[in-house]
Amino acid sequence: MPTETERCIESLIAVFQKYSGKDGNSCHLSKTEFLSFMNTELAAFTKNQKDPGVLDRMMKKLDLNSDGQLDFQEFLNLIGGLAIACHESFLQTSQKRI
């Protein structure tokens, strides 16, 4: 039986695979696939953005090799960055309660 961490890893892989490949390459997210992922899986984040260009800038910043798409490692950089931001927010909220 997989551990909670192993299930989380499996889930990240499954989500990446769910969105990648619709434009032909199952090892990468195209810009269209990235936008679909963001608007579906991170809809609250996307809807709260006042700047319409934020997703384009995120894609460019995450695309470390400038090939116009995100591989799994580049995708994980997004997930890691969001996890760090959530963790920092949690810590700030916890410290305010003390």
Swiss-Prot record:
Its subcellular locations are: Cytoplasm; Nucleus
> What PROSITE patterns does its record include?
EF_HAND_1 (PS00018), EF_HAND_2 (PS50222), S100_CABP (PS00303)
Q: Which organism is it from?
A: Rattus norvegicus (Rat)
Q: Which UniProt keywords apply?
A: Acetylation, Calcium, Cytoplasm, Disulfide bond, Metal-binding, Nucleus, Phosphoprotein, Repeat
Residues the entry annotates as binding Ca(2+) 1:
26, 28, 33
SMART domains to which the protein is assigned, alphabetical: EFh, S_100
Domain EF-hand intervals: 12-47, 50-85
Described by its record, this protein's role is as follows: Facilitates the differentiation and the cornification of keratinocytes.
The record's section on InterPro entries has:
EF-hand-dom_pair (IPR011992), EF_Hand_1_Ca_BS (IPR018247), EF_hand_dom (IPR002048), S100/CaBP7/8-like_CS (IPR001751), S100_Ca-bd_sub (IPR013787), S100A11 (IPR028482)
Cite the binding residues for Ca(2+) 2. Answer: 63, 65, 67, 69, 74
Q: Which GO terms describe its cellular component?
A: cytoplasm; nucleus; ruffle
- Which intervals of the chain form a coiled coil? none
Q: Give a Pfam family name.
A: S_100
User: Which named protein is this?
Assistant: Protein S100-A11
Q: Locate the Phosphothreonine modifications and list their residues.
A: 5
GO MF term (any one): calcium-dependent protein binding
